[in-house]
């Protein structure tokens, strides 16, 4: 109930702030809002799962709420800060529609921390201190009283799932899919939009069949309400006016003409490459500071997996790759690292609680950490992709590819957070702890200082 009210308050606050800054709510902006709601739900799930863990081991309600909030804080902050880095990059390097998406995402992240972390924490603590729920712990855990059995330590769910051993099957499958899909896409060629090929894109808002004579047609895409024709010629201002007038007279409707010169094309490609590289560097730096470098490397490889899977999906099904697709990739990177960091935080906590770490204990740490965050990962992904599926079915055709990219990327992200990032971290950490330490050379006696021309 508290989480539901907090989510409603968060949504209203997002619209209010966007209105106060006089932002234009575009379709990508709505998509950012839905993504933000998913991240807000994630913050609530993490907090309540930590509180439930404490209640299950017999900790009193008020203390359980305090401990649960303390334990969840680092996960939520780390996850949101990495996504914030992506949003800032999008805002700086993106175009108008992408800037709208980034602006809404930045607002959502700030409000998530303000409302879903601090305000919700304060309200839950007030309920706990009231004493009303001291004998109604089952309302917080979500289990009947008969099934609540206090334990000495947090019970590990999904004990039958061995994520570490199953990597022997899953990692080769991932490798085959990526290599096979990428090879197929490169041979057949990607369907790049005019943003990356140069030329002129002409969209006529009509249900009639549109034809265009006298130009070198690159491709034609038709929907129920419009037809988009891409030509290789780069029209000047006079040619654009002439063609626009001709199409309006012929089809009695408006025509949107978008010209990408060679200079603009190069700039768009440059911005896309810079955006992705800066995103990776920013995440690597932050994760290295907050965790350790092997966490950062593992996380980056997982992000590459998500980016490649999404790109391969577009390549295999010949979906158009444009500047909005790059925005989708950056969003996927932000969301996926969010998921990965939550699991990394659990690994770090479990690591600190173990002594005399060896390879077998590392496997147990990874397995237990993934099991503890598995339910949260599934629930968060489901609550995020449901609105995206609704946008795919009922939304405008202009952002169909954007939403498809998010859908594929988010599913790939939850998969990589289980079978890529954690498993790679296990390999790197196993090597680190088994690597023989270099012993400092000890001198049995003080060596004579040699000075040229004096004693040598």
Residue map of PLM features:
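A structural signal for conserved, well-ordered secondary-structure elements
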Residues: 1-456
